[in-house]
Amino acid sequence: LKFSPTGPSFRLRNWIGRLMRRNHRKVLIIDEEIVFLGGVNVKAKFRAWDDMYLKLTGNLARPLLRGFAKSYISSGGNRRNVRRFLGRGLEKFIPIWRDKLKFIIHSPNSASLPRGQRVFSTALAMAKETFNLLTPYYVPDRKFLKAVRLARKRGVKVNIFLPRRTDVRLAELIARAYYDITTRAGADIYFLPDMHHGKAMTVDKNLGMVGSMNLTPRSFSHQEESGVSFTDSEMVDELNALFNDLRQRA
């Protein structure tokens, strides 16, 4: 077992950014063929939390090996140990899935920042009937709230699922400041009785997403995140069924 904390080097000129930045991805890769990806942390106290993750098997797991290799190197690992994972060839997985499944590998220091920041607003703009969102920490920006208002004008039912209480008191207080403006924009907020750490989204019956991204500025600007979006109808239906279960519990 080898362990290296993220960001081993230190530079005075960007010490604040390094202080805020962290690797928030939650990805488990087993034998290069099985991947668990979502919001699950590894710590004893988190066992009591509800969470959500996606399991991928076979060639579908290969594109994430490249992201792991980059994190391994940036954490101080020897590049030679993961060189074979850095080739683009790993991303050429089963052709039939290429248009049905896309990985979201977000880094605050890369061009993926706008993409990561627009994930939720762009998805909401696509909705025609229903938009479901699960996030434990909720600090929406103006673009997201505007997207909620426009969606309601189109007749879209916007459902946002949040835990009634979280493990971060400050984050909970900040989220409460947005409840009223969010409902006035047209969304329905469902409060879950237990701590739910999952991060997921569905757009109608057409699109689903599971990952580690919270709807907060910190998640977009300072954290490395991972997720997977999918359009496979069975996968989206299953995720919508989970949202229906959450609605019954709220």
Regions flagged by a language model, labelled:
Residues 1-250:
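Charged, low-complexity intrinsically disordered terminal segments
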